[in-house]
Amino acid sequence: MTWYVIDGMDGSGKSTAGRFVKDHLESEGRSVLEITHPTEHRVVGRIADRFLHMPGGKFWELLAALFYILDVVASLFYVRRVGKNYDDIIFVRYSMAVAYVPAGLVPLTYRIVESVLPVPDVKILVDIEPEIALERILFRGESLESFETPERLAKVRRKIMMISDGWYIVDNAGSDISLREQLLAVLRSEVMA
């Protein structure tokens, strides 16, 4: 079993990348379980998502982070139970959520997360300029999360890049075709490794 994590800031195209990786692996006859965080089918995931849309700042963001962590841990237990039934597991969003904490805490928080939670086999970071991310977020027509402003997205991106060592970085500023080609190159390099 290979465990893939696809992560990045809001609006980067993580879900699109996750779908592509899943479709590609399934086209090769592999069975794939894909889990996107926060998960809609789990209470803690729905609560985390709800808190992300609350006005009022830091208090709600802290609660969202707490429920996000609970959601991820629940997914890890779920994979432990059913993972043997799949060739591959994909998590869309995982440890890069630490980039949403204050900048001074990001490296330490990331090291703690990496030492406490299981480390995936393949880590893919979907990168994008904050302006393009915001355009895509607005195009979706959903209500904005508290972090989805140009300034906050730029800060989050800087923090993500601080902790991206060991990640495959794909640039999603271009077309879906470009994204697919980059992801396919990552998958090929993993097969050859």
What do these predicted regions represent?
Residues 98-101, 105-158:
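A glycine- and Lys/Arg-enriched "phosphate-lid" helix/loop adjacent to the NTP-binding pocket
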Residues 1-64, 119-122, 165, 175-193:
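Glycine-rich phosphate-binding loop of ATP-dependent small-molecule kinases
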Residues 5-8, 90-91, 127:
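Generic enzyme active-site microenvironment
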Residues 89, 123-125, 169:
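Short, well-ordered beta-strand core segments
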Residues 22, 131-193:
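NTP-dependent small-molecule kinase module
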Residues 33-111:
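ATP-dependent small-molecule kinase phosphotransfer cores
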